[in-house]
A protein has these predicted regions:
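Alpha-helical transmembrane segments in multi-pass membrane proteins
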Residues: 1-5, 27, 31, 35, ...
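Hydrophobic transmembrane alpha-helices
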Residues: 1-50
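Short, charged juxtamembrane terminal tails flanking transmembrane helices
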Residues: 169-179
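Hydrophobic alpha-helical transmembrane segments
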Residues: 25-26, 48-53, 68-69, 95-99, ...
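Generic transmembrane alpha-helix motif of multi-pass integral membrane proteins
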Residues: 27-43, 54, 58-59, 77-86
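Interfacial aromatic-anchored transmembrane helix boundaries in multi-pass membrane proteins
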Residues: 12-21, 55-84
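Short helix-perturbing small/polar motifs within transmembrane alpha-helices
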Residues: 1-5, 72-110, 162
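Membrane-embedded alpha-helical hairpins and interfacial helices in multi-pass inner-membrane proteins
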Residues: 96-170
């Protein structure tokens, strides 16, 4: 799943609007069914936490240290949703965990502004980041209308990805006796 996410990020990075506004939503839409299958197939406590911790480690390796604790927290929230015995087989719980995981994935874009904008801005400009990128980032993530759209789009895509995943699991995997 991490490889799919990285590949989609590469595709979206050629346009600031697509990268900042659409990419997270599309990524969680595409990964929703895979995440739902992971949770349902493994069907053990800690699967979501393990996956999201690995995502955090990838971000840590790329220099975004603050995303490791974020993804561990997101993993713990998803594990709390799936905590009861048999919840990994409950489509509603799987959809809820998928939606929360996908929606909170938007934290990768929001945390730099919320936690340390001055440091992020200084580092970006000193590292040679394109000023247009930084200005667009500021436009999309500080303008309430754009932020509302981005969050609503991401939430809708995360929910849709979870529903698609749950339906695919019921239609194909459970019918075939794999799950």
């Amino acid at each position: 799943m991490i490889v799919i996410q990285a590949a989609l990020n590469v595709i979206f990075m050629f346009n600031n609007f697509a990268s900042m506004v659409l990419s997270t939503g599309v990524i969680v839409l595409v990964l929703g069914p895979v995440y739902a299958l992971l949770i349902t197939r493994v069907a053990k406590r800690g699967a979501s936490l393990a996956y999201l911790t690995m995502v955090g480690i990838v971000y840590l390796a790329s220099g975004n240290w603050y995303l490791l604790p974020w993804y561990v927290l997101v993993g713990l929230i998803c594990e709390a949703i799936l905590w009861r015995g048999g919840s990994c087989q409950d489509p509603r719980k799987v959809i809820a965990a998928c939606t929360v995981s996908g929606f909170l994935h938007q934290g990768t874009n929001l945390l730099p502004i919320v936690l340390f904008w001055d440091t992020y801005y200084a580092f970006s400009t000193s590292a040679g980041q394109d000023p247009t990128y930084v200005n667009d980032y500021l436009l999309y993530y500080t303008n309430p209308a754009w932020l509302a759209f981005i969050l609503a789009f991401t939430l809708a895509c995360a929910l849709t990805g979870g529903v698609i995943g749950s339906r695919l699991i019921q239609k194909h995997f459970q019918k075939a006796g794999v799950l």
